[in-house]
Design a protein with these regions (language model features):
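Conserved AAA+ ATPase core "coupling" helix
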Residues: 49, 60-98
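AAA+/SF3 P-loop NTPase mechanochemical coupling elements
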Residues: 17, 34-54, 102-107, 152-155
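C-terminal engagement/docking regions of AAA+ P-loop ATPases
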Residues: 125, 129-174
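Conserved catalytic/switch belt of AAA+ P-loop NTPases
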Residues: 6-44, 66
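Short conserved motifs of the RecA-like P-loop NTPase core
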Residues: 4-5, 98-119
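Alpha-helical scaffold elements adjacent to nucleotide-binding pockets in ATP/GTP-utilizing enzyme cores
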Residues: 17-25, 63-67, 80, 84-89, ...
Length: 174
């Protein structure tokens, strides 16, 4: 099994054309006798299962895309993102920033506000970055003596992340 992660970001430059090499690697007729030009040795790739990931298919050359079976995977729902944040991301970022459970609390409403008003993605990277930003600001409040314990809520989330970034389809803040 070989994972080709974010294949849509592969580019060509003066050093070579990666997509041409991938064409040879992914072609079932040619990959039995693939020649690795870097090491100068032949490699039999005929029994390898290739899995490629991409965020945007338009960045993949047509001939390369023709050698793949495209399986679209939908992003997380807002509810799934909430549970991922609650069960994993909050704890991870809290520990990363050296905060104890008693020093930092974030309620469900605040997490849901971050998801709906500060992120616009299928995954949770931006959600994690925003929770991390909240934690850093909590650290500053504690280190400056402004507060000993910080509870982040739906009502005060803008104090930590600023004005909402995203609106609903009607142009209204969600």
């Amino acid at each position: 099994l070989m994972l080709l992660d974010e294949i849509d970001k592969v580019s060509s430059d003066y050093k070579g054309d990666v997509s041409s090499a991938l064409l040879e690697v992914l072609d079932g007729e040619q990959n039995k006798e693939f020649n690795d030009h870097y090491f100068g040795v032949p490699v039999d790739l005929s029994n390898v299962l290739f899995i490629a990931t991409a965020n945007d298919l338009s960045g993949i050359p047509g001939p390369l895309l023709d050698r793949m079976e495209v399986i679209n995977i939908s992003g997380y729902t807002e509810n799934e993102k909430y549970h991922i944040a609650k069960l994993y991301l909050v704890e991870k970022t809290r520990e990363k920033n050296g905060l104890t459970k008693s020093q930092f609390k974030i309620d469900a409403g605040a997490i849901r506000e971050i998801i709906s008003h500060y992120t616009r993605e299928a995954g949770v990277r931006s959600l994690e970055r925003n929770i991390d930003k909240v934690c850093r600001k909590v650290c500053r409040k504690i280190l400056t003596g402004e507060m000993d314990v910080v509870k982040v809520t739906k009502k005060n989330i803008q104090d930590f992340l600023g004005p909402y970034k995203y609106k609903d389809e009607n142009g209204n803040l969600k």
